[in-house]
Structure formats: structure tokens, C-alpha cells
Amino acid sequence: MPAAVALVTPDPSATGVPLSVMFDLGMAADSMMLVAWELGIGSVPATVYRQGLARELLGYPEDHHCEFLLSFGYPADPAELTRPLQSGGRRPLDELVHEDRW
């Protein structure tokens, strides 16, 4: 059965809220997604664009903000977890990564 997690923080635009709260939020989301994958559970982040609607549905306080949601679920086909990466569509790494100079 799929599940979702709402990542709610103090409003990052409010006075006194450190910008690091967004970094911390990203780190927490990343950790949840990595642990889920280790357990064979897939995940997808979704940005919340309509704060008013999210607040109404989830009931979090006015002085808080829900930047995004994480959805979790088992893949429909377990073989997808072990299939090797397929080539196609990706640029070679040496076109994207530069060392010392561009």
C-alpha cells in the first residue's frame, strides 16, 4: 500500500528561521528515500505549490510550510529493482564533469 510523508517546517521566509532549515529538510528527505530504497521501497518527491490547500488538507499551523511530499510504495514488478541500467539518452560523463578547468 502506498504511503506519503509531508515534510513540514517552520516557514523558511519568516523572520528568525535559519536558511539551514531547507538544507536540513533536504537531508532528512534524502535519508528517508535512501533507507526506503534499501528496504525495496521506491519513493518520489513532489513539490507543494498550493500551501493553502496543503494546509487545509493536512492541518499544519499558519506559521509552518510544507515544501514537498514524499510518496513511498513497492514497485509493481520486483524485477525492476535488479535490472541493470540501460544505455540511452544520457550524455557521457566527461561532457558533464570537468577537473581543474572547464
Model segments located where?
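Glycine/small-residue-rich phosphate/adenosyl-binding loop
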Residues: 1-25
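Short secondary-structure boundary segments
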Residues: 9, 47-48, 74
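C-terminal helix-cap and adjacent tail motif
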Residues: 68-102
